[in-house]
Amino acid sequence: MEKITAIIPTFNEERHIADAIASVRWADEVLVADSFSTDRTVEIARSLGARVIQREYGYSASQKNWAIPQAASPWVFLLDADERCTPELEAEIKGVLSQGTAHDAFWIHRVNHFMGKRIDYSGWQSDKVVRLFKRDTCK
């Protein structure tokens, strides 16, 4: 299987970071791109084996684009700290990367929740984002 880095952008995510990292522990590298958190985010991430890099936050895309070239692996999986990679998604990603692919990027369908309940209407039920891609090809 081709190697993959999971990148998790953070700022004061101590409530979420442990579960986010646990959901991508299967990745070859977990890279936390932190915006100088003032809580225990960095401490928790390092204690769980993540590599932490830091810079001041500009905006979401700039933070992610700054982190992407620092990934050690040719494939990148972006995960926000309040998101989780399900075992089903993990299996699908591993399947794609173990077979080889001509594609440079993949859409990931998301299941969104609001106040603890799944959103099944209003357009959010079909939400998808590009979160799995080749490091040197996409931004």
Predicted regions and their residues:
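A conserved acidic beta->alpha catalytic loop
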Residues: 23, 34-46, 80
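Acidic helix N-cap motif at the loop->helix transition within catalytic regions
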Residues: 18, 39-48, 88-89
